[in-house]
Amino acid sequence: MGRKFCVGGNWKMNGDKASIADLCKVLTTGPLNADTEVVVGCPAPYLTLARSQLPDSVCVAAQNCYKVPKGAFTGEISPAMLKDLNIGWVILGHSERRAIFGESDELIADKVAHALAEGLKVIACIGETLQEREAGQTEAVCFRQTKAIADKVKDWSNVVIAYEPVWAIGTGKTASPEQAQEVHAALRKWFTENVSADVSAAIRIQYGGSVTAANCRELAAKPDIDGFLVGGASLKPEFIQIVNARQ
């Protein structure tokens, strides 16, 4: 069975009630390729608004959640709370969480494991900085981040990996389709050697570095690219074209 193409839109800390309602209208009108799974990462205050205004065919994700069900963790939200709001997905380990908020590989792995245990689906992000790429450490960094998650996760059926070359996020720089495919293929090989051939064949690996309507089709044609995690472009009507990159 082929891997179902999965496109995530990460709205980050953007939007208000009016603009999110507008985005929901764009997504509802589409048309969206029925063979592509679509997930939008919405700011926490607007999760219920987005869920209420989007068709069931579009999934809604939180952009973060904590590693325990409840307690004295001011400002955090738990997977149980997201489930209570009918939110089925969460984005974890995004490069901005790692860089700006200091989240470690281990914390992210704990969050992923807990979210899965609570019944959420997870987009787990990994990727290297420009310094790391220029030092030839791309694979070492991606494998280290993936191994941290693999040490805590046994069932991968509800995990999508998002490879984000950090140097290509919001910079207008893009990995070439060949560069992206090379890392995706290396990650799949890592899963074969360190998890299992079955997981390697089934797991979806999204590409997440400055994806636009202009470059999405060429990227989508690569054999190991199973979707995208889209930042800025997910706030614009061109997101529809990115969702439909395989049509």
From Swiss-Prot:
Binding positions for substrate per the UniProt entry: 10, 12
Catalytic activity entry: D-glyceraldehyde 3-phosphate = dihydroxyacetone phosphate
EC number(s) per entry: 5.3.1.1
Pathway(s): Carbohydrate biosynthesis; gluconeogenesis; Carbohydrate degradation; glycolysis; D-glyceraldehyde 3-phosphate from glycerone phosphate: step 1/1
GO biological process, alphabetically ordered: gluconeogenesis; glyceraldehyde-3-phosphate biosynthetic process; glycerol catabolic process; glycolytic process
Matches recorded under Gene3D superfamilies: Aldolase class I (3.20.20.70)
InterPro entries the UniProt entry points to: Aldolase_TIM, TIM_sf, TrioseP_Isoase_bac/euk, Triosephosphate_isomerase, Triosephosphate_isomerase_AS
CDD domains with a match to the protein in the record: TIM
Record-level Gene Ontology MF annotations: triose-phosphate isomerase activity
Residues forming the catalytic site: 94 (electrophile), 164 (proton acceptor)
Record's keyword annotation contains Manganese: no
Keywords, in A-Z order: Gluconeogenesis, Glycolysis, Isomerase
The protein's assembly and partners: Homodimer.
Similarity section: Belongs to the triosephosphate isomerase family.
Name of the molecule in the record: Triosephosphate isomerase
Gene behind this protein: Tpi
